[in-house]
Amino acid sequence: PPALALGIEPFRNHLLDRKPVNRNASIITKSMIFTIIGNAFYITLILMLQSSINILNVAEAKGETVMFGIFAFSALFNAFNCREFNFDSIIPNLTKNKLALQIIGITAVAQIFFTQVFRDFFNAVPLSVMEWIKIIALSFTVIIVDEVVKFVFRLFKKENKNDENMPKVEA
């Protein structure tokens, strides 16, 4: 459901400032590939850390349910990262698509509800409120890490533009 809501993102005025794209160009840019691989790597990393060293410090019997929760919430929070192209921050437009926020919120509540209520069907165990908070907090770091990476890339891009404007020194 979050993917469908992303399809109705409001128009971004800054998109008009970009250079036209060749009609034969790939729909997936290098920055998108980098972001997809980077976020997949980070989600895999936190899942591996939870699996190997139990970073959330939960009972072993709850391990699989916690892993499922981390995966589901990481994917859900990663939907926010997909709202902007290239290395643009999601923060300025975070609350502009109310429908997307509602759908993501409903999906988050449904994730917890179905895991708790239909645990036998999902082969899960009930989790405490504190365990859900830990899962959500860890999963939310997908947004934080993505924003930090985008910020660093914007800084380097800005520095490179400044370097291009500097006069060349011949040796």
Regions found by a protein language model. Give the residues of each.
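C-terminal transmembrane helices and immediately adjacent loops/tails
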Residues: 1-171
